[in-house]
From Swiss-Prot:
The keyword Ribonucleoprotein applies. InterPro entries: Ribosomal_uS8 (IPR000630), Ribosomal_uS8_CS (IPR047863), Ribosomal_uS8_sf (IPR035987). GO terms for molecular function: rRNA binding; structural constituent of ribosome. The keyword rRNA processing does not apply. One of the primary rRNA binding proteins, it binds directly to 16S rRNA central domain where it helps coordinate assembly of the platform of the 30S subunit. It comes from Methanosphaera stadtmanae (strain ATCC 43021 / DSM 3091 / JCM 11832 / MCB-3). Belongs to the universal ribosomal protein uS8 family. This is Small ribosomal subunit protein uS8. Disulfide bonds: none annotated. Keywords: Ribonucleoprotein, Ribosomal protein, RNA-binding, rRNA-binding. It holds the Pfam family Ribosomal_S8. Part of the 30S ribosomal subunit.
């Protein structure tokens, strides 16, 4: 089976395991982008610890789930957003103001839309989590 979008598959795996009430999940294949998204989700307390395990191929992430995710998904197409336009996409992808995060890739790295707003930079939308 070939994967068309590993990031979308990883988030679907996390969401399905959260809905089943599992304590952990395995994400494969691993990538730098998935690692950065997971670390951003960890900073915002949506997931627990995660570790990269070398399986001789692309690698595997073992992720601890804490039960804080109601829904998460990938944003397609990956819209380019100015720092003044984040509020429009908050209304579109998040259920309420100040509830959930948008994860954005910027020239300074992967961060939440709140951090990007504070830094005054734009980027491309990757993920919504609430």
């Amino acid at each position: 089976m070939s994967l068309m979008d590993p990031l979308a598959d990883a988030l679907t795996n996390i969401r399905n395991n959260e809905l089943q009430g599992n304590d952990s999940c395995v994400i494969k294949p691993a990538s730098k982008l998935i690692g950065h998204v997971l670390s951003t989700m960890q900073k915002e307390n949506y997931i627990g610890n995660f570790e990269l395990v070398d399986d001789g191929k692309a690698g595997i992430f073992n992720v601890e789930l804490v039960g804080n995710i109601n829904k998460c998904g990938v944003i397609k197409p990956r819209h380019a957003v100015k720092n003044t336009e984040f509020e429009d996409y908050e209304k579109r992808y998040l259920p309420a103001k100040n509830f959930g995060i948008l994860i954005v890739t910027t020239p300074q790295g992967v961060m939440t839309h709140h951090e990007a707003k504070e830094a005054g930079i734009g980027g491309r939308l990757l993920v919504y989590v609430y």
